[in-house]
Structures are given as C-alpha cells and as structure tokens.
A protein has these predicted regions:
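Acidic/polar loop patches that form or flank catalytic/metal-binding clefts of enzymes
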Residues: 3-8, 31, 53-56, 90, ...
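Generic recognition of flexible, low-complexity loop/linker segments
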Residues: 16-18, 53, 87-89, 139-140, ...
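Rossmann-like NAD(P) dinucleotide-binding subdomain of oxidoreductase/dehydrogenase enzymes
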Residues: 1-83, 101-108
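NAD(P)-dependent aldehyde/semialdehyde dehydrogenase
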Residues: 105-176
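Extended low-complexity, polyampholyte segments enriched in Ser/Thr/Pro and acidic residues
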Residues: 92-94
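Catalytic cores of nucleotide-enabled group-transfer and carboxylate-activating enzymes in metabolic
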Residues: 22, 70-71, 80-84, 88, ...
C-alpha cells in the first residue's frame, strides 16, 4: 500500500478515531461496527468545515440457514466452520454469522452439541475497543435476563480486559 494508507487503528479510547476523522488529510471514512460508533463518526464528519462522506455498515446480524440434508451429512464439519467463523476477529467482522436458523431434529441437536464443544476450545481474542467489549457484555446480561433464552456454553472466568467470553445461546423460533 502507498505510504499513509491503513485499514485499521487500534486504541484504548476514541481519541485516535476523532483525530483521524477530523484530519484535513482525510477525505472519506469507511466504518463497520455498531450503530452508535458509526453515528458518532458520521456526526464528526458532517461537522467538519468541509464535510466528508462516511461509508458505514452498522449493527448487522447475519442469519445462517442450515437445511436438514446438509446437517445430516456434515453436522460436525459445519459446527467447526461455524465456531471459527463467529470467533474470527473476536466476532467483530461485518460478515460474521449471528443467528442460526434450522429445523428441530436429532441432527440439529448433534450440531449444537458439537458447536459448543468447538467454541469452548477456541481462545478468546481481544476486541478492538473497550466500549465494544462493554456493549458486548451488556448485551449478554440482557440476553441472560430473558427466560426464553438458554445459554449453552459453560461459565468461564476471563481476566484479560477486552477478551470476551464465547457464548452460544438457544431460543425457539416461537419465542424469538
């Protein structure tokens, strides 16, 4: 890449992002992440003396449909692939799957059991920002308060800041 071009900046706060968006050298911003973060970037960019465009994908949840024939043949491999896919980048990629939709069956039960086993073997990785980590944990707490949702992964204690616990939860289509 040419000098001065980058695709990602990590920091412990929002100061780097604010400086970047406000820099007169920056002519546009691309962002993938939360609605709150994207909106903050948009607001900064629009308040500049010479406003700049913001290209943002914010707050997506990507569904995955798993059909019975595929599940019957490849439940173990699908579970392994899905576990890797949802944990890559600490789950922060815009293309990460977010929800599985399938029919209830013995094969689906085998898939879920294997998924939990696979995900519990993957070490947590650092999230991009403390606010993302905090929002993730607040979301988990909110989900735990819903009696229709059951958490399938075991409780673990992670002491590293910004390293989230991997969680698989279940809710029926009727209750969703």
């Amino acid at each position: 890449m040419p000098n001065g071009v980058f695709s990602n900046l990590n920091s412990k706060g929002i100061e780097v992002g604010i400086k970047l968006v406000n820099s007169h050298h920056v002519k546009a911003v691309g962002f993938t992440g939360s609605l709150k973060g994207g909106r903050a970037i948009y607001d900064l960019a629009s308040k500049r003396i010479h406003p700049i465009p913001v290209f943002a994908e914010m707050g997506s949840v990507n569904p995955v449909l798993i059909f019975p024939k595929k599940l019957k043949k490849e439940y173990a491999e699908l579970a392994k692939q899905y576990a890797k896919s949802i944990t890559v980048g600490s789950g922060q990629f815009c293309t990460n799957p977010g929800i599985i939709i399938s029919f209830e069956s013995d094969d689906f039960d085998l898939f879920i059991k294997r998924l939990v086993e696979e995900i519990e073997q993957i070490s947590p990785s650092c999230m991009l920002h403390p606010n993302i980590y905090n929002a993730y944990n607040l979301g988990l707490e909110k989900i735990k308060q819903n009696s229709n949702v059951s958490e399938l992964t075991r409780e673990i204690n992670i002491t590293d800041k910004n390293y989230p616990k991997h969680v698989i939860s279940h809710v029926s289509a009727e209750k969703f």
